Curated annotation (Swiss-Prot):
Homodimer. The tRNA molecule binds across the dimer. Consists of two distinct domains, a catalytic core and a N-terminal extension that is involved in tRNA binding. Pathway: Aminoacyl-tRNA biosynthesis; selenocysteinyl-tRNA(Sec) biosynthesis; L-seryl-tRNA(Sec) from L-serine and tRNA(Sec): step 1/1. It comes from Streptococcus pneumoniae (strain Hungary19A-6). This is Serine--tRNA ligase. Pfam families: Seryl_tRNA_N, tRNA-synt_2b. Keywords: Aminoacyl-tRNA synthetase, ATP-binding, Cytoplasm, Ligase, Nucleotide-binding, Protein biosynthesis. One of its GO terms (molecular function) is transferase activity. One of its GO terms (cellular component) is cytoplasm.
Amino acid sequence: MLDIKRIRTDFEAVAEKLATRGVDAAVLNEMKKIDAKRRNILVKVETLKAERNTVSAEIAQAKRNKENTDDKIAAMQNLSAEVKALDAELAEIDAKLTEFTTTLPNIPADSVPVGADEDDNVEVRRWGTPREFDFEPKAHWDLGEDLGILDWERGGKVTGARFLFYKGLGARLERAIYNFMLDEHGKEGYTEVITPYIVNHDSMFGTGQYPKFKEDTFELSDTNFVLIPTAEVPLTNYYRDEILDGKDLPIYFTAMSPSFRSEAGSAGRDTRGLIRLHQFHKVEMVKFAKPEESYEELEKMTANAENILQKLNLPYRVVALSTGDMGFSAAKTYDLEVWIPAQNNYREISSCSNTEDFQARRAQIRYRDEADGKVKLLHTLNGSGLAVGRTVAAILENYQNEDGSVTIPEALRPYMGGAEVIKP
C-alpha cells in the first residue's frame, strides 16, 4: 500500500512513476480531489467540535448562573448534527480512498527498466551454456510419461486439467529437489519454517493479493480462508501487526509448501507439462530488512536462488523486469529463467522482489530503530528458491539421454539413495 503522504507531497513524481505501471493519471487526479475534500471536511469537523466545546462550556457556566440555556442547547444540538453528518460523509470518503490506496501498485525503484511488458525486460547476466544435443530432445511431459514417473491422465481423471501424479522416482526426485533447496538455504542463514497452507483474508491483504487478485486464488466457500498461492503469504504475515527489534534485522525465512493458483486468464497457455499447474510445490525465501539494507539483501537473495541452479548445473539467465511486467507489490524484481531445451527458450523458475515498505504498510510490520528509538516500517523481500515442478522439468529436459533415460544431477544423488539414472 502506498503512503498517502508521499502521494500528497510528491504527486507529480508519483504519478509519473505509476504511469509506467499502467496507472491512468485520471485515477490519481480523482484520488487527489477526494483526499483534498477529506482534509477540508476534517478541518470543518475540528472547527465545529471546537465550537461545540465552547458552547458546552457556556451552557455549564449559564447553568451555574441559573440563566436560560435553551438557545445554547439548541445551538449545540445543531453543531452535533452537523458533525454527525460530516463524519458520515468522511466515512464514505475514507472508503473511497482505501479503495484507491489498496489497488494502486507499488512505485517502481529508479533502477527498474521502464517498459510496457516482458518484451522490455533487461537481461542482466547468463550462466552456463545450453547443451547441444546430437538427437532430438523430448519435452519433459513426454519424458515423464515414457519413464512412468509423471501421470497427467490420472491426475485429470481424479481432479481435472493442470493436475498430475508424481510416481516412483518422479516423486523421489521432487522430494530430493526441495530437500536439497531447503538445505542450501539453511547454509545461507535462512530459518526453515513449516507454514499453514490455509490463510485468512487479512493475510492475503497484507501481502497484496487481496482485494485486487481474488480471482487468481482458491477460496474455501463461506469461510474467511484461502489456500495459499505461495508461502510468501504466511511467511510475511508471520510478523503482521508486530514491532520487531531493529538489532534482530535482517531476518531470513524459507519454507517449502504447495501453492494453489486458479490461473485465471491463462487459458491456452502452457496447457501441457509442469510449467503452469493449479497445485505445485515451491520453496520460498522471505526477508525482513531495514530500508537502507533492503537492496543489498535483494542481490543476496537473487544469488541464493542462482546458487541452486548452479549446483544443479542448469543454464539460466537473470533479467530485470520492466515496470510493466513487475508484480503488483514489487518495487524491483529479478527473474531467473532456466533453459528448457524442447522449447529452445528460457522460462521463469524464480522471481526475487523487494517490495520496500509496500507490504509492511499493509500488514503493519514495523521495527524499533536502535539508533533513535523510533518505530518505523521495515522492508520485506520475497523470492522463489525455486519452483520445484519447473526444476523437475528443467532437469528432465537438460539431463535426458538418447535412450530415453535421465541422468540425475550429482548434487541430488545423496537425496536419491545414490541413484544415478532414471530409466524407462
